[in-house]
Amino acid sequence: MSAEIIREIDVQSVMTKSSLPVGGYSVNPYVGCPHACRYCYASFMKRFTGHTEAWGTFLDVKRWKPITNPHKYDGQRIVIGSVTDGYNPFEEFYGRTRLLLEQLRGTNAEIMICTKSDLVLRDLDLLKQFPKVTVSWSVNTLDENFRADMDHAVSIERRLAAMKQVYEAGIRTVCFVSPIFPGITDVPAIIERVKTFTDLIWLENLNLRGQFKTDIMTYIREKYPQKYPLYEAIYNRKEMSYWQNLELEIAAYAAQNQYPYRINDLPYGRAKQSKPVLVNYFYHEKIRLNNPR
């Protein structure tokens, strides 16, 4: 746990209309995230909340008016954890995400949870009560040393163990291979590791912008100097050939192994055992919602 400044704040509503490509509502029971991921795009939230502290060192715990009519969200998609992790370590004490799920019981909305934690296992009893629920874990490496350099979340093995348990409980799971670090993330290795207990594998490339670009580029230069020219080409000279070639390689790999493959799609449903659907999100702005598989 890396958050040093924790405060409780009152908000009118925890439900926010989403501008994300996945649509629906974006719900974040916390402001900030103690995982302190070095590449996290959500660090931009600082400028809207008055925080000047380093990302990962603060956490606002939201208190909201109770959701009394969960049917208001019927037919919607509710994404929990778009700019925080609802199952960050402090959730074990504050229980805001569990409270949210309790208040949403009865809705037929599609619940989508994004996490890097295994604390979600605590709420399996609640998750089973929703007709449509998906839990996704971010996994962009099988190398625990690289993982530890990038975030303060639980180990990859704990994430995968949780994914397997949720899958076996009958809940749809996603392995979110994000962000893909050029020359470092081994996409096929991750797919082969998780294929028996996940329905979808989302693939998203590393985007470097804002303050964390300098940090990541410095890290690559110091820890992976042989990769630095590649990062220079992609992120300073805006060359796209690496991603274009990787896209072709993934498509060929999917065809060879008979994995369904989609581009910028958000299919719903369970996959065949050991045949997860691979979804390429290299171009988020063109995502098509709910297209049939």
Can you name each region flagged by the protein language model?
Residues R105, K128, L160-G170, A251-N257:
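Surface-exposed amphipathic alpha-helices with a cationic face
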Residues Y25, I78, I111, V135-W137, ...:
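Hydrophobic faces of well-ordered beta-strands that scaffold small-molecule active sites
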Residues S2-D10, P188-R293:
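Auxiliary Fe-S-binding modules of radical SAM enzymes
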